[in-house]
């Protein structure tokens, strides 16, 4: 929240996030040029440089202690039995009243790369949707800062990599945090919010909320009340129970979504977290997860 919220219309800044700008970002970020953004590849380097350049354009500073945007890491990809060199991207807006307390917003910048037949997995929804949303959110925050309205707490925009290798970028950050985990009040994790699943064809303005009440009832209540006040999405909690069945990859299985995205490493450090998600679809981890299928108007 920003200072002087009783006289500030926060929707002014929220409305700066437009379908047009999201689409412009996506058609670059999820293009063939980025070669599926696999961690440890040249495509990932293109992705991290794109993010850095966009943050510099909007005036949001790097989130490393030396002011840099890149957190280099060498991580072991167990599924492939090899180490890879990869990078998280961090951008930072300092808070006003409680600058040492931190809200961390996450999405993963990587995807699964190129198939053996040369087809590119563009990863528009997974997780170009979360990545581009974060860029636009950061710009909205910075517009408020430019008007003299800093958030009460500091905000770290953390684009983690190697999520597709096993949540490795968020694990690395949790073990090597730029800001103390004990000062991190919450994590908001955004992964796959660009499509409409089969359960919501009749009401596309929805969002799955996962984990909001696991460590903090306050976080759950604030999330619900802010939704009711400003955007009025249908908040669907069915997957908050990890045992709820989902049809995925050709079969029914327990969803376990609470354990399958980058918020997990914050939760494991006792940081309350919410996972924002719109569900899976037939293009999940396929070359058909492309920018033209994203619902930018949602």
Language-model features: where?
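Bacterial Sec-dependent signal peptides at the C-terminal "C-region" and cleavage site
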Residues: 1-11
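His/Asp/Glu-rich mid-to-C-terminal helical/loop segments that flank catalytic regions of hydrolases
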Residues: 9, 277-298
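Extracytoplasmic/secreted proteins, especially bacterial periplasmic and envelope-associated proteins
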Residues: 12, 17, 21-24, 28, ...
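Acidic/His- and Gly-rich active-site-bordering loop/insert found
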Residues: 29, 83-113
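Solvent-exposed loop/turn segments at secondary-structure junctions
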Residues: 33-36, 55, 61-62, 77-80, ...
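A non-catalytic alpha/beta surface segment that caps or lines the substrate-entry region
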Residues: 37-93
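Alpha-helical metal-binding/catalytic segments enriched in His/Glu/Asp
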Residues: 89, 105-166
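Metal-dependent peptidase/peptidase-like ectodomains
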Residues: 160-267, 271-273
């Amino acid at each position: 929240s920003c200072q002087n919220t009783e006289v500030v219309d926060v929707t002014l800044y929220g409305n700066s996030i437009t379908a047009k700008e999201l689409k412009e970002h996506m058609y670059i970020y999820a293009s063939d040029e980025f070669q599926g953004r696999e961690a440890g590849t040249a495509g990932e380097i293109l992705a991290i440089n794109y993010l850095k350049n966009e943050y510099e354009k909007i005036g949001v500073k790097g989130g490393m202690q030396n002011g840099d945007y890149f957190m280099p890491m060498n991580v072991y990809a167990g599924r492939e039995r090899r180490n890879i060199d990869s990078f998280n991207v961090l951008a930072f807006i300092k808070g006003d009243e409680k600058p040492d307390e931190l809200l961390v917003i996450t999405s993963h910048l990587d995807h699964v790369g190129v198939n053996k037949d040369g087809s590119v997995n563009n990863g528009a929804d997974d997780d170009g949707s979360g990545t581009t949303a974060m860029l636009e959110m950061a710009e909205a925050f910075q517009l408020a800062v430019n008007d003299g309205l800093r958030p009460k707490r500091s905000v770290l925009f953390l684009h983690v990599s190697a999520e597709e290798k096993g949540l490795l970028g968020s694990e690395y950050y949790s073990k090597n945090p730029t800001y103390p985990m004990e000062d991190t009040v919450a994590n908001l994790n955004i992964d796959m919010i660009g499509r409409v699943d089969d359960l919501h064809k009749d009401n596309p303005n929805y969002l799955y909320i996962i984990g909001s009440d696991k460590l903090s009832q306050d976080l759950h209540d604030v999330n619900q009340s802010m939704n009711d006040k400003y955007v009025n999405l249908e908040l669907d909690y069915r997957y908050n129970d990890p045992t709820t069945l989902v049809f995925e990859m050709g079969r029914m299985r327990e969803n376990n979504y609470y354990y399958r995205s980058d918020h997990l490493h914050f939760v494991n450090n006792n940081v309350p977290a919410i996972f924002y998600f719109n569900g899976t679809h037939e293009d999940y981890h396929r070359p058909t997860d492309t920018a033209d299928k994203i619902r930018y108007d949602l």
